[in-house]
């Protein structure tokens, strides 16, 4: 079976929450990550812009050897995935369906909250995915446009971030949700703040782990090796290459806060300018 190389992309550092799950669920897998930091945030971009970004990034990832693509961005998953599957032969998976399935599984009351970018909320993909799984579940959606810029500027755990989180979550609290989908891969950077605001009675769903588990099963069905045990006694490692369309230094600084170390190597590439 082919070992394969996984390509992931997001508007910025948020997709690193998915890379982290790849390192656990797909040990030893070669990974190429593209952060489109020149165009972050994606939530206020038009459909045409999002399709253009996705097409160029996926083409680049494939040129670098990726033969399986994980959309590490909810906005692109909601807007671009279906069309990109038509344009490329490489298999792809997005965050929406696995995240919706996890929320339906965990919700006891069927009252599911969603915070996401404006584009993801407008696309309605999570509501459709949840309804397809269980028509008795309701999705209460809230766009949270200020959160991605806060994460990208390294302000995840600040009073400014907590004020914004409280503002966005209050309408969902009033709806009596028992489960909240973190509908943007940047939002796990804010997990501690969100948990403080909502308390333990609301379960948080990060679609990243469910998506990578689904990717692993899909790879096995397609004849890929889902991991790389290597030679006997060889420790599993994840081979990572990072590319960004904006500042490599800015990406390293914010990513280092999340990873506990600065990612290397990070290469700036003028792919989308």
Swiss-Prot record:
Catalytic activity: L-glutamate = D-glutamate
Protein residues bound to substrate: 10-11, 42-43, 74-75, 185-186
Biological-process GO terms, alphabetical: cell wall organization; peptidoglycan biosynthetic process; regulation of cell shape
Key word Cell wall biogenesis/degradation present: yes
EC number: 5.1.1.3
PROSITE patterns xref list: ASP_GLU_RACEMASE_2 (PS00924)
GO MF annotation, one: glutamate racemase activity
UniProt keyword list: Cell shape, Cell wall biogenesis/degradation, Isomerase, Peptidoglycan synthesis
InterPro entries attached to this UniProt entry: Asp/Glu/hydantoin_racemase, Asp/Glu_race, Asp/Glu_racemase_AS_2, Glu_race
Active site: 73 (proton donor/acceptor), 184 (proton donor/acceptor)
Pathway assigned in UniProt: Cell wall biogenesis; peptidoglycan biosynthesis
Family: Belongs to the aspartate/glutamate racemases family.
Cited NCBIfam families: glut_race
Function text: Provides the (R)-glutamate required for cell wall biosynthesis.
HAMAP family: Glu_racemase
Protein name as it appears in the record: Glutamate racemase
Organism per entry: Desulforudis audaxviator (strain MP104C)
């Amino acid at each position: 079976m082919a070992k394969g190389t996984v390509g992931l992309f997001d508007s910025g550092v948020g997709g690193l929450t998915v890379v982290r799950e790849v390192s656990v669920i797909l040990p030893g897998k070669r990974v190429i990550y593209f952060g489109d930091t020149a165009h972050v945030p994606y939530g206020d971009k038009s459909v045409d812009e999002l399709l253009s970004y996705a097409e160029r990034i996926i083409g680049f990832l494939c040129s670098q050897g990726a033969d399986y693509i994980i959309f590490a961005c909810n906005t692109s998953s909601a807007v671009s995935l279906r069309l990109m599957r038509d344009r490329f032969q490489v298999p792809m998976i997005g965050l929406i369906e696995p995240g919706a399935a996890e929320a339906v599984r965990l919700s006891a009351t069927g009252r599911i909250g969603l915070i996401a970018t404006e584009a993801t909320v407008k696309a309605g993909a999570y509501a459709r995915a949840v309804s397809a799984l269980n028509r008795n579940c309701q999705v209460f959606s809230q766009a949270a446009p200020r959160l991605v810029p806060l994460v990208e500027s390294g302000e995840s755990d600040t009073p400014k971030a907590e004020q914004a989180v409280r503002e966005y979550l209050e309408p969902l609290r009033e709806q009596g949700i028992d489960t909240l989908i973190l509908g943007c891969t940047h939002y796990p950077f804010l997990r501690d703040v969100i948990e403080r605001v909502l308390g333990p009675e609301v379960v948080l769903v990060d679609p990243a782990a469910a998506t990578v588990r689904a990717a692993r099963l899909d790879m096995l069905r397609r004849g890929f090796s889902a991991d790389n045990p290597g030679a006997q006694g060889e420790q599993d490692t994840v081979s990572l290459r990072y590319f960004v369309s904006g500042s490599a230094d800015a990406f390293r600084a914010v990513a280092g806060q999340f990873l506990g170390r600065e990612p290397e190597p990070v290469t700036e590439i003028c792919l989308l300018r």
